Structures are given as structure tokens and as C-alpha cells.
Curated annotation (Swiss-Prot):
GO BP: any one term: acyl-CoA metabolic process
Cofactor annotation: adenosylcob(III)alamin; Mg(2+)
Protein name in UniProt: Fused isobutyryl-CoA mutase
Domain B12-binding: 20-158
Sites where the protein binds adenosylcob(III)alamin: 33
Protein species of origin: Paraburkholderia xenovorans (strain LB400)
Pfam families according to UniProt: B12-binding, MeaB, MM_CoA_mutase
Residue positions binding Mg(2+) 1: 338, 377, 429
Keywords: Chaperone, Cobalamin, Cobalt, GTP-binding, Hydrolase, Isomerase, Magnesium, Metal-binding, Multifunctional enzyme, Nucleotide-binding
Amino acid sequence: MTDLSTPQRAGSHKLPAGRRLRFVTAAALFDGHDASINIMRRILQASGVEVIHLGHNRSVDEVATAALHEDADGVAVSSYQGGHNEYFRYLVDLLRARGGERIKVFGGGGGVIVPEEIAGLERYGVEKIYSPQDGQRLGLQGMIDDMIARCAEGARAAAATGESQVGAWAAEFSEHGLPRFDSRDDVGVDRQGAVARNPSSEASRVAAAGRGDHLDRGVRAASTADTADTANTANTANTANTGSVADAADAADAADAADAADAASTASTASTASTASTASTAGIPDPASLVFRRLAQLISAFETAAIDVNTRDKLSALAEVTAIPLLGITGTGGAGKSSLTDELIRRFRLDYGDALTIAVLAIDPSRRKSGGALLGDRIRMNAIGDWGGGARVYMRSMATREASSEISDSLPDALMLCKAAGFDLIVVETSGIGQGNAAIVPFVDESLYVMTPEFGAASQLEKIDMLDFASFVAINKFDRKGARDALRDVAKQVQRNRADFAKSPEAMPVFGTIASRFNDDGVTALYRHVAEALRKHGLRSGGGRLAAPEDLRFSSGRNAIVPPARVRYLADIAQTIHAYRERADAQARLARERWQLIEARRMLVETGEAARSTVATSASPGASASSKANACTSTSSKANASPGANTTANSNASATSGTATPTDALNPTLSQLDTLITQRTASLGERERILLDTWPEIVAAYSGTEHIVRVRDREIRTALTVATLSGSEVRKVSLPKFVDHGEILRWLMLDNLPGYFPFTAGVFPFRRENEDPTRMFAGEGDPQRTNRRFKLLSEGMPAKRLSTAFDSVTLYGEEPHERPDIYGKVGNSGVSVATLDDMKTLYDGFDLCAPETSVSMTINGPAPTILAMFFNVAIDQQIARTTQRQGRPLTEDELAATRRTALENVRGTVQADILKEDQGQNTCIFSTEFSLKVMGDIQAYFVEHGVRNFYSVSISGYHIAEAGANPISQLAYTLANGFTYVEAYLARGMSIDDFAPNLSFFFSNGMDPEYTVLGRVARRIWAVAMRERYGANERSQKLKYHVQTSGRSLHAQEIDFNDIRTTLQALIAIYDNCNSLHTNAFDEAITTPTEESVRRAVAIQLIINREWGLAKNQNPNQGSFVIEELTDLVEEAVLAEFDRLTERGGVLGAMETGYQRGRIQDESMLYEHRKHDGSYPIVGVNTFLSAHPHEAPQPIALARSTDDEKQSQLQRLRAFQAQHRDAAPAALERLKRAVIDDENVFAVLMDVVRVCSLGQITHALFEVGGQYRRNM
């Protein structure tokens, strides 16, 4: 039997009795790369650690606040987006300033954080930055063990000194009282008073330190460019409190003279990057924040029984002085308790004007085997932060530990301490419960039970204890099937349980809610009743700021993104593809049998068995067919040129028509053959007969030296051969040599030539001779710098194919700011664009409406705003050109005509794929529902204004792959997302052929074999589904896609080897006829690529396209046995994944449960484990290692934005805002009203971007569209 009594922890580090290590994990601000940190938090949990995971895109303030309020031992942050020097320094500073000196900071960023920067950050105070070499040396578990050991040592040291201090605080507070919140006198009026009440307390000392120079110096140092990595010596030990040159000289004892000199330089110049307001707001803790920190430490002390009984009794008595209402929220696992809790807190804050102070105690289960716990409620909370008036919400995540129920044994003490602190409201959220659990009820005044509609038969409700005790019941996820019936059944059960038959079931406190929907009226109705009930238990009167909803108890209906009747669309598509393949096999069999019959008849005639026939075979329609077949098959070349389709073409006048001559009637064998031929011909489909009929013509067209197509009395000639130096003629398109009509037809139906349905080999018959598919990604610094890079990349190119990389600040819809964790990322890893003026500068000198100009913009969350800016630039360019040409101002009609012409001609792509952002890349900023609504608005605008040459979305698998997905998952999820957009746009009433041509795709090419056929499978599935299921035209059937070589396959070790990997990935992309291609620079593993490394990356493509011999042929993959086998294997695997997604409610239903994200994380972990144990060989990383690994690597030039560029952006932003300060407020109100009234938001954005900056627009949309809620 298995002993479950004690945890079997992986870590054997000795800790004080009852002590558990607690870690906060997160990805840095404006960083969606959370694959690594997710792996780390999983291993931490399995190693016995309690993990509070915050997810991606977390500011320093959010991480520091969580660490302090959760009383964490360590913080682990991944940073792959640059700005790490500022981020980690600022984090160390904030923790020190707010009383978290003992909290150890760990970090990692692959090769992005170079050794010199690692050394600098560790000298500054970061406990450890793990490098790729550390990972190689220690392995994943080894790195985790090292983190645990370092924190365990700190915990033991703290136990020797810190717990006695906490005990002293507890004793002091038990005598004099905790600094209580006095919300009745308006919290925040006297920010210093609460501290002054206990002048001898540690809180006073920390506040004094925060008001001094320490944090201001830290902000200044952290706000320099990344080149300040060696300036860290200015903060060694207790030196550098003023940031002066003298401080740097003092620091020379801890570092070399060069470091000190750099520190002095930094200290003298960095002040331009900080402001006094930054230091005061971020560094000086407000009184509530100080109370929260001490409260967190006291809760931990009570958990370890470090507080004596006498002190506890005094605190308990103190807690009972004031009646403080307690709300308990419990329910089944996965019911959405955390989201609903957050939405209720949001409504309390809004309704009371943010005057309430609220404590949230969230409990999650511990794992018995390891003792670890994933405390995952905080990641879901959007409404607990500082709204500008100081801290109002304290949250503590608790593990059940040895408790046998859904609550922690420490909950009573935690509630007592929260009461003693004087919160206005305390909310307790339990872990998931079963039918027989109701442990929360005795601890709270009012309880809320959260469930979903999927509870089974109505009889199951009789077994649920909480339906007896709950004050309120919320049926969350009310948009699911059967929700109305569930509401009725639960209400009746509650009525029976209460024996309250004087009221109707509809009057029972049972509510239907959709917590995932922003501003859901069902949640608001629930809030109204909960707040009213809590007022009876001491909740202060007030509120009334929220509009009262109609008298309802459930969420009102809205149009579903994908209508319920269409929710099985992916399974239907899979069935369509399978049916098409079955048809191809069946039709090929018929064609083969028919051809065999014709051949048999021909051979019978030729051998003389029908020699007695006196009628010449040429007079016989059947013989005519046979002779034609004979002519087609007499030589292999002739057989290839004519598959016997002539028989089909003449089937009504030949033997295949079933008409027999008198002579044939005398020959039973020939007559029977004719009958069989007629039957097979009749069974062939019309499309299939046409394919066989036209094949000889196609063969003839491709057999010469030129391919000639006539379009509107104009001939387009394409050379069909390329001569080699040896004199060989290499055909641009090679044809199969099949003779068997079945093989020909099967190949035509499943493969076919490039440019022919199902477009497996490519969507165009030939590549453009004068235009390589090169599209290089560029973006760095300010718009002027990137504009220069664009001109460099496109120099000498007949086509200007620009691909724009935005910095992470822009990617998250924000704008430049002096705050260090923002400032460090401005212009790094992309270009900073905050205003319409920035966009004009970025594309200055390029005619955006010229046929040879195409612009791709890689941006998603704020894509509608950025696209509106881009379209305005294109329109303004054309208006300026037309005005100059006319020599006068344009009339209103001329302006309108010019705008329409610009929109009709502008070419390019905006990524704007919000589904893959939720699943992989994580630059979602708005609620998913709102983002999808605005995507539909963009497409509707395209249809209305005739935008035909611009792609409204680039449905992207690249970022799914970069997050860790294998190639099959990348392809399956990407195609599934594409079909989801199709269903969503159809549901809005758009025609398939109006919007399908505006959809494009974006894939990664890696090293696995499946990448070789990614494009083939994608094109075939899309084409067949578009034609067979949606009835789309040929233009809509063509899937066009961009390829970027794998960033994940670039390694910081043996960095020069990266170009070899990129070359192979580019080769298979070109072989597969991708429509455009980006080749990564070899140094992207550690930095934004330099001009030289980008030139090398471009050269990879040019060498393949212009030098590589086999690339002269444009369908080299066709005819390969392994390519065909892989194509079928990958297609079948994708369709199987479609079925799995369907089982989970389609793409949106699967996203709700985190299915795609979970699969991606599992696949990422498999890759990481196999990379680290060497079973997945990577040359230069885990095999073929250098014989001299410790030699200093050749220094790589690090591309970083400069201080001048950052300051320039700040100045440009403020100048734009000052210029439009009068018009901006009205424009923002107009935008918000458009959202509320369900207008086309993008159409309004086209006007708003002319007077409002990106950050202003983003925050206005947050108010009415909601913020994205992170998933685990």
C-alpha cells in the first residue's frame, strides 16, 4: 500500500518545522515567452515548493508586490525580450525599499543575457541569472535544486533572526493594534499617518529608506541603456546611495577599475532617464502596502506556529472589535471561481469609488506526494492592483498542506489577522470541492457556491451539500449548452432544500454568470445581491456608482462568435477531407479499371482475336478509342502526354458510349469490354473526367521551351527550362511519367502541378522571376533608425518587401515611459511606434500604394490601432501626391476618391491573430471576445472599402512553434484558428469570397522532418475545405503563407552554427514554394541582429535562389516517396487533432480549458528534457562539443537602443499629445461609445489615431472592452 500520510518531497533541504518554500514565478514585462518559466514552475512544484505563478507580461511592481504580499522566499523571472538590466535592477531596488531584502531574485533569458550582463546583475544583488551553459551543466532539475538550496539557506538564516522579530511585531501589535485601515475617513488621505502610529516599527524604517536616495539611485541606474551592465558596481553592499562619481570609486574595491569607470559614467548620465515622480510612486510604500507586508509575514509566522499562545489570544480579541463581513466562495474545480472572484472585486471597487479595502485569501490544494502546490488564483486577478490611489486589495495565496479539506488549517489565523488589520471586506476562495464538501460555511457570513451547467442528471443536485448552505449559487460559464435548463433545475433544488415554496424558483438566489465576459450583466446582478447581503454584516453603506441592471438573474444573450449549430465545424472539415480522399481513391480506381479495360480491348484487337471483323477499326468508335489509346501508350513519352482522356472526351461517340457495331455484336468479348468501359466512364465524376481530358493539353503546354498564357489579348511567356554550365536543360516544372490513368487521376486530385487545385505543390504556376520571396524582419530603436534599416535591406531590390518588428512596449499597446522596466525596453528588439507621426517617419520614402511595395506588420493585441495608423499614412501619402500633382487643394469628392484608391491599392499584411496569442505568444491585451469582435470589424471594413490587396490577418503558427509546439501541433492549431475566423466572419453575414482572400498564414520551419511538408499539407487541407465545404471560389481556395526560419533552433552556444540550421530550413521552405521567407540572423539567439548578420541572413536566401542548382526547378518535392508519405501522415495527424479540438467545443472551447496551451507546454518540456539529456542531438550544444569550451567566445556586437533614441521617443510622444490635447478627450469618448453601441470600432479608430497616441487608445479600450485574463 502507498503511504499518503507524509509528503515525499523531491528536495531534501532541511527547513524549520512547518516551513515551506514559496516562489513567485513570472515572465518579465512586455514578454510573452513563458514556455521556460512554465517548465520551471512545474519542476519547482514537483520539488515541494509552493508556487505563485503570475504568468507573462508582469511589471516589476506586480512581481515585487506579489512577492511581498505572499511572503515569498524567491522570485524567478524569465526575460527574453531585452531590457533585462533595467528590469532586474529595478526589481532588486523595489524589494529592498519595501522590506523584502531577504527575498532572493533569480532570472534567465537564454542567450539574450550575455555573460558580462549576468556578472553585472549578480553583483548588483540578483541572486543568480542562469545561462545556457548553466542549463547544460546542471540540467533543468539541477537548476531548480540550486534555487531551492539557496532559498532554503536563506530561510534557515531568517528563522534564526527574522522570526523573533516577527514575534516582536506580533506582540507589539497585540498590545497597540495593527495599523488599521480607516476607510471611513477616506483611505489614502494621510499616507504617513499609519506609519507614524508605530514609529519604532520596521515599517517606519522601510518607509524612511524608501523616501531617501536608495531607490532614486536605483531608478536612475536601472533607467540607463542596456550598455550599463557594468555599472552595477555602484550598488555593491551599502554603497552608491547617491549615484555619484565618488560612489563608483568606492565600488572599485568590489570590482575592477574599468567597472568603476563605467559606473561613474553611468551615474553621471543616467539621471536623464528617471523622474522624481517615478521614485516617489514606485519606491515609497504607501501605508496600506506596509501593512500588507507585515500582514504577510505574520500569516507565515502563524503557519509555522512561531507566535506564542498569549499573543495569539490578544490578537484574536483585537480582531473581534469591529464587525467585518466575510464572503466565502467555493465550488467545483474548473468552474471559474477565480475569474468570478476577480469580477466581484472589480465591481466592489467600481461601485464604491475604490474606497474599500479588501483582503482575498485564496486556497489551492497541495500535492500529497511532493508537498508542493500550484497557487494559481493570483494569475487570474486583474482587479487587485493599485488603481492610482494606493493599495486597496491584499491577496494571500494559501496551500491546504496537511489539511484534509478544501481549506487550509491556517485559515482561522489568517482571517483573524485580516480582521485585526481592519479591512472593509474579506473574501475567501477555497480550492475545488466535491459534492459532500461545505467546510467554508462556518468561517464566513455569506457563502457563494460556483458551479457549471455540466453537473449531470438533476438527481445529482440532491447530493451537493453546498446547495443546502450556500447563500448564493452561481452557474458560471452560462454560455454553455444547457445552461438555461441547469438554472431551472438548480433553482428548483434550492427551493426544495429551503422548503421555500412561497416563492417561485425564479426568486431563488441562483444566478447565471459568464465571468470570462467583460462587464457581464449576470455577474453584475449577482454582485448586487451579494453586496446587499454583506451590508447586513457590517459592509459600509455606499456604492451606487454601478448602473443597476435590469431585473434579471442570468447573463443576457449575445451573438456567439461561432454559432452553436456550427460548433462542430472542425470535425465537419475533417470529415470533408476524408471524404475527398476516399473519393480520390475511388475515382482513381475507376480510372485505372477503365484504362485497363481500354488497354485490354486494344490488345485483343491488335493480336487478331477480332481479326474476323471486316469493319476497319477506324470506323468503329470503340476501335477509335482503342487506337487513340494505343497512340498514347506506344512510347513512354507519348503515354505521358496523353493519358487516354481522349476516350473520355469522345465517350459519347466511341466504344465507351456503349454503341456497338454489328461486327462487335458478333464478338461477345469486345462487347462485354465495351459495356464495362461504358459503366466505368459513367461512374467517373464530371470534375474527374475534365481532369483527364485536359491533362494532355497541360502536358503539351509544359513540354516546350516556353509556357504561353493569353490574358485579355496579351501573351504572358515563361521560360520552361534553365541551362546549366554543363549544357543540361533543367525544367522549371517537372511532370510525372505516369501511364496508368488511375495514378494520373489520383495525383491530379491530391497533388497536381503548382497553381492547380488542390494547390499541394503551390498556389501559383511559376515563381516570379524578378522577385525573390525575401521578406526580412527589421525593427530597432526609434522610427528613424528602422527607416534607415528598411532602405538598406531593400537597396537594389525591384520589390520593396518590408517586414516590421515592433518593440515589446508597442506590442503590448503601451508607449514609452521613464519607469525603468518600461524604459529599458523602448526600441529594443523592435521599433518604438506610439503615434501616427512615428508611423509616418517609419515608412518615409516608400510609396505604400505602389504595386512593388508590400509591408508586413507583426503585431497582434493593438493591431487595430497600428493598422489604422498605417492606413492613414498610406492615405496621407496619396493625398499629398495628388495635391502636388493637381497644384491645388483637393475637393471633398477628390479626397474621398483618393482615400478609396489608396485603400484599394495598399499591399501588405498585419498579423492580428488573437487566437494564437492566447494559445502561444501571449501579446493579448484585451479580452478575447472583444479582440475577436474588432478583428471582425477590420474585415468588415475591408469588404466595405474594397481593400483587396492587404491581408487583414496573418494566421500564425510561428509563435505557437516558438512557444514549444511540435510541427504537427503548430499546423493543426494554426489551420483550426483559420477555420475559426472563417466561421466567425460567416456568422457576421460576410460572404466567403469577400473575406477569404484577405486571410494569410505564417509558419515556422524547423529541423524536424514534418516541416518539409508543412506547406503542402496546409494548402491541400485549406483548398479542399474551401471548395468542398464552403463553396469558395479559386482565389479563396489558395492558401498563401510566409515562412520564418525557427528562432527556437538558434542557440547561444557555438553561435556560428546557427547559419547552417537556417540554411537548411530556408532550403525546404523554398522547395515547398512558400510565398515569402524570412531567414533569421545567426546572432538572434542573443541580440537584435546587426547589419552584418542580417546581410548574411539575406545571403542565405540569395545563394539558394540564385546559385543552388536544384532550386532552379520549382517543384523538386513532387515525386519523392518520403515526401508523399510524410504529406499523408501529417495530414492525418492534423485531422485527428481537429477531432480532439471538436471534442472540447472547437477552438474557443478548447482555449477555455487551456487545452492548446497545455499541449504546447508538454511538447516544450519534452524538447527541453531531451535537449538536456542529449537524446535529441544538437550539434555544439549537447554533441560535437568544442575541445576548448572554456576559451573566451568571440565578442558579439549587442544591438541596443540608445538613450538618445529613447529620449527622442519620449519627446515626440509628449509633443504629439500636447499638440492634440484639446481634441483627444472627445475622440476617446467617441471611441468608447462606438464599443458600447456595437459600432464598427475600426472605422472609428481610423479617425481617432489622428489625435490620440497608442497608450491613450489602449487604456480607453480597456475601460469598455476589458483586459485579457491570463491562463495558467
